[in-house]
């Protein structure tokens, strides 16, 4: 939404927050609208709604209705914000999956963040690695720690993109991630 409610809820660490996005899987010719909700005990719940590929970027009436319903089901209140696109991003993703245990790791590179005012390109040599294991102590987590690649807490690509595109001026919690990606905004001094 234009007020960046999702960003500020994330930045403030609100327990009940959501993020809405559309995903276009180019190679698979698939498109989804997704809502990610923080549920009980901090667990993330994700709901996906299949959308026509040729309507990528347009959150249709059916998808909006299902998103609002998912929000209402979990939080027992209505999602009142306008659902409008405020940024776009492109990247190439590699996903590695363990043969046993369900551990996954995603590696995103070639990131480009865009909005109506401009574009921010991340150096192609820089990547975002995300590990997905039950207790953050999987094989990939251990290897990354041995290589002194420690996680940056609560740094979603969505939040990083808004700070990098200068849509928000409060981004102190994101500074470690922004520095690693060499995209610290220079327009103003960050505030808490």
Predicted regions, residues:
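Phosphate-end processing signature that detects enzymes handling 5′-triphosphorylated RNA
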Residues: 1-192
